[in-house]
Amino acid sequence: DLEDFSFSPTYLAFYDKLEKANLFLENILHFADQDLTDRETYTLLGSPLPDGGQWDMAISLIKKYGVVPSWVMPETVHSTGTAKYLPILNRKLREDALELRAMAKEGKDTAARREEMLAEIYNALCILYGQPPRSFDFEYTDKDEHYHCDRNLTPHTFLEKYVGNDLDDYVVIISSPIHALNRTYCQPFMGDVVEENMFWLNLSQEELEDLTIRQLQAGEGV
């Protein structure tokens, strides 16, 4: 019933960066026995905190953190352009990675130090994006000029009440002829949330085109 509404990309971008930092440190510890020049570790250190993502990554964030209206956590100078600060955070994460690798090789417990590192990333993101809200009042005027106020919503309760939980009804489809068709593939060590994985269903180009047309005809974007 709203004439104009948008979700906050800044809110999800904040947690996207935080979760990617956590996944980076998780992967660094997983490959702690490797040399720095080994393929996996070298690739990880090349881009600790990448921009962008895919459907599965967005859904993982939404399921874990919920969503908020754009005015609850608006854009900032840094949320609209990451080029100036990402090199700084990437350098910090590389330094953290070297420290955790050294601790792991010495047989030390890395959990507490890793939490401290993530807390530092969190604080930096708060400076860049603002601190994410724990709750908010959803105030709006509908098309009939009637005022509404839904108080003390959390990002999760807002998601459940106004968006729904059917996001898992969607799957990511690709068409890669160099891989077996009609199979689901998983890409390890990628994504944002450690607890989630990225999956793709590989179909023929003809099936991909047919499903695209049918989804558009059903009134849903692709």
Q: Where is each model-derived feature located?
A:
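Catalytic-core signature of thiol
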Residues: 2-222
